[in-house]
């Protein structure tokens, strides 16, 4: 189960490791001024690699599915769907129960965490609360961008995939949890921020955003920055 570009590295690992897979993704949507029908990156990947795919429905029952793996999927499974398809796991990009919710990678950078990781857990009716079957940590350096962390996590999943026991009953998550939020466009604005916070936001939002500021009534999008030891300031790009 996947629906955006962040799903593809995980889909690639599973495709290269399993004899047979079927991908479930979201239907095309109409977008832009011309309201053209646009397919998502996962559907494009499936078509390019001759992978069977289906469109998601909350009413679907996948009787031939041994296990299901969700990676960056845009839908929340209903209780009825979970009951009918009860062997589905999610790949969450944090060390659960820390940083539950929609923005764990970005929040880890904003929190100045020194490490994060990924968690594979059995999906239940709540959000990111199911029994954990596998976790692996990765480091975060002070100059890492979100894009670096996404790549590091998918590489770690690829390296550890064969070690994940999907038949495991898993372990309950502890009660010491934290949650992330869905960011709004206003959160990407660094105009009033200190230098330290601005730099942190630029790194955290280079995929989701980017960060921006304004100058002479123009919006300036900032994807990255560089610092020179002999410079009087920072160069934003």
Which functions belong to the PLM regions below?
Residues 1-213, 218, 227, 235:
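One-carbon transfer enzymes
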């Amino acid at each position: 189960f996947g629906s955006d570009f962040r799903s593809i590295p995980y889909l690639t690992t599973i495709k290269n490791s399993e004899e047979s897979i079927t991908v479930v993704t979201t239907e095309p949507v109409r977008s832009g001024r011309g309201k053209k029908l646009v397919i998502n990156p996962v559907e494009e990947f499936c078509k390019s690699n001759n992978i069977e795919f289906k469109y998601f429905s909350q009413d679907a029952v996948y009787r031939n599915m041994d296990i299901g793996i969700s990676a960056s999927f845009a839908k929340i499974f209903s209780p009825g769907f979970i009951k009918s398809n009860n062997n589905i796991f999610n790949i969450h990009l944090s060390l659960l129960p820390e940083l539950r919710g929609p923005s764990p990678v970005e929040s880890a950078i904003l929190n100045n965490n020194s490490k994060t990781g990924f968690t594979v857990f059995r999906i239940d009716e709540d959000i990111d609360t199911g029994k954990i079957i596998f976790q692996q940590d990765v480091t975060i350096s002070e100059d890492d961008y979100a894009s670096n962390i996404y790549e590091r996590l998918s590489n770690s999943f690829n390296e550890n995939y064969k070690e994940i026991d999907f038949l495991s009953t898993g372990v309950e998550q502890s009660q010491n949890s934290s949650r992330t939020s869905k960011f709004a466009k206003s959160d990407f604005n660094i105009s009033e921020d200190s230098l330290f916070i601005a730099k942190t936001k630029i790194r955290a939002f280079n995929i989701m955003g980017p960060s921006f500021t304004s100058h002479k009534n123009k919006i300036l999008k900032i994807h990255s920055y560089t610092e020179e030891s002999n410079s009087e300031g920072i160069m934003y790009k």
